[in-house]
């Protein structure tokens, strides 16, 4: 599955046009199994919801052209230290897993009706929702910074580090800022992200992508 996720990482782009076709029972079951695994592993409360009523804000409805999608991942968990980062990491996994299973996704951190969604997953901190469904297209690659703009390595960078940076640059970030810096020394890697309302989520997404590209067995987060 790691190889499939790596391929999905290269193919996955934000999709805002969906064809309105609902998820099949098999697709929902496949996604729910992944949600359950992530919740158990990281002690989260992510939910896959079906909603005829749109959970989008006015801005979200404006950005989504064509037919609306009615399936969403609600990224939720107990309000604790690093919960945003943990949900960003898990959300990234779900996006790539959906892509690997022929579906498309859209992160909607700032474009959903928070009051309505809170009623669906009560008593938890909700950091974002992710639309999931059948896209009319596969989206387009986002503009990207260069490897030199976001990373440095003490000495000659090993292949795993370079592959990790390439993967991190494929990660979706809030308004495509890519406001991260990754530094390496030996097998130790540090990640810093410019402070902002979405920085925790973005940091988790970047970590997930870097690990897929570099291989978790090759380094340690410092």
Predicted features and spans:
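Acidic, surface-exposed loops and disordered segments
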Residues: 1-222
